[in-house]
Amino acid sequence: YKYPYNEQLMIYAQRPNATACAEYDFWKDRMGRYVQRGSTGIALIDTSGYQPRLRYVFDVADTAPRDAARSFTLWEMRAEHEAKVCSMLTEQYDVPQDGGIIAQFERVADKLALEYWTEQKRDICGIVADSFLNGYDEDNIRMAFKTAASTSITYALMARCGFSPDGYFEPEDFMPVFDFNTPAAVSVLGTAVSEISQRVLRQIEITVKRHERERC
């Protein structure tokens, strides 16, 4: 979730089971790990220069620790973290805690999806041509975007935090997503979901890691 939407797609297309990706130098210099012989890098497109070029990242599964390597574990949200995470979400986003953490995820997703629409509605309305959104007025585009984005964000938060979104949502909950059925529309929705999910998950990660440090 720490990569932008277009890079998430490229990582998933090449290595759907990847869990934590970084460039060779990060694993070597920052983490004290080496990329194992025979590993294949995941190609990403770097557009930061005058001309696009490929850069490569490696999943943690492609690496192994050297002597005195820094410990590396993916953060995991457990039941003991929920109270701290709920308090953080209330403080950061002014959403109530009643109904449990999943209900709180939904409220946060609703709020941030609407904020994103307010800031980006001109761009969103500019990509409706040839999609199922074509012909909608602005209010209906807003509702379609908010519902599609909020549901997708909640799904992403639940999945990364160890819940089972497939058992929580019904297929019809995702019907608004299918209105975004052109490459431009998919990109707009995917970028929104990626940016918002990243923001919330980074805050959850910080909260979980702080709780673990306080226990030590």
State the predicted function of each range.
Residues 1-216:
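N-terminal accessory/interface modules of nucleic-acid-binding and processing proteins
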